[in-house]
């Protein structure tokens, strides 16, 4: 009985989701996809045989430092640059987006050859940096402070771990449009298409590159290859002092740690604990 009740509530939720779409898409059927750590994702199949990608964003974006209006602004610009899949319907207030379907696997499932990845991501960044700079800024110190303030319980080991980083000074000399989550799961195919723009905002490009290095498990040489390829494509360095990405590596670890602690409070599980352990180890 419990299983049937659970299935029934799931079907009701999916029907409610379909009802929020414009009429042409309400007749489709939803098939759940492997969701990200914060989103619910579906394949929407229409009677015509066409498919679309339906994304329902996290219900509490403020807790995670997500600005839906900025996400939508950047997404529209990214479509124009050929970075993001065309969008057929969007409700920025709720994080609902209906996109073209893409059959290409993400880089977790089928990564391009390692030697090509820095150049491909340099291409993503050069096109991304052509967009207008958003008014909403994701500065690492303020962003991490927001996460920390929302923790219901601060681990006893955290103050000593963060003390040195918080006493340092991070670069703050360049602000450009940033995705802030260019991890392998958010890159589709060899183009690549970029998905999940939730953390998009103005940011320091060095933090973007440091985040790429961490989430792709790159060595310094691959990060440096990305930066060199970017300079060649853009016709010069980024900002007055270059990427300065090494200075942002501990900030990537710190923000990743706080994010995982926040998510674990809401939904404890092994995935979040693994992220907590990894980022804590990197900061020690």
Q: Model-derived features: where do they sit?
A:
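ATP/Mg2+ or Mg2+-diphosphate-binding catalytic cores
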Residues: 258-284
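An alpha-helical support segment within catalytic cores of ATP-dependent transferases
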Residues: 9-25, 130-180, 184, 242, ...
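A general structural signal marking secondary-structure boundaries and capping sites
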Residues: 21, 82, 125-133, 169, ...
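Active-site acidic catalytic loop and adjacent metal/ATP-binding pocket
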Residues: 34-46, 50-54, 165-207
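N-terminal non-globular leader segments, chiefly Sec-dependent signal peptides
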Residues: 2-40
């Amino acid at each position: 009985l419990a299983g049937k009740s659970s299935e029934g509530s799931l079907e009701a939720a999916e029907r409610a989701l379909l009802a929020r779409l414009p009429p042409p898409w309400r007749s489709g059927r939803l098939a759940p996809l492997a969701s990200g750590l914060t989103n619910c994702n579906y394949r929407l199949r229409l009677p015509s045989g066409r498919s679309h990608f339906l994304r329902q964003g996290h219900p509490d974006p403020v807790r995670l430092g997500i600005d839906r209006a900025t996400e939508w602004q950047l997404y529209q610009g990214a479509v124009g640059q050929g970075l993001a899949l065309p969008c057929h319907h969007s409700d920025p207030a709720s994080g609902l987006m209906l996109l073209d379907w893409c059959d290409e696997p993400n880089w977790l499932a089928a990564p391009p050859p390692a030697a090509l990845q820095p150049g491909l991501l340099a291409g993503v960044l050069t096109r991304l940096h052509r967009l207008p700079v958003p008014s909403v800024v994701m500065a690492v110190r303020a962003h991490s402070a927001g996460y920390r303030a929302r923790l219901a319980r601060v681990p006893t080991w955290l103050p000593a771990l963060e003390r040195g980083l918080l006493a340092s000074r991070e670069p703050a000399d360049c602000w450009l449009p940033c995705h802030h989550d260019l991890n392998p799961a958010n890159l589709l195919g060899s183009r690549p298409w970029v998905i999940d723009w939730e953390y998009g905002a103005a940011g320091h490009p060095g933090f973007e590159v440091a985040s790429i290095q961490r989430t792709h498990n790159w060595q310094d040489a691959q990060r440096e290859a990305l930066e060199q390829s970017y300079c060649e494509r853009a016709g010069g360095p980024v900002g007055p002092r270059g990427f300065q990405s090494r200075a942002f590596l501990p900030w990537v670890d710190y923000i990743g740690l706080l994010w995982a602690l926040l998510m674990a409070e809401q939904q404890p599980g092994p995935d979040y604990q693994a992220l907590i352990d990894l980022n804590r180890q990197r900061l020690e």
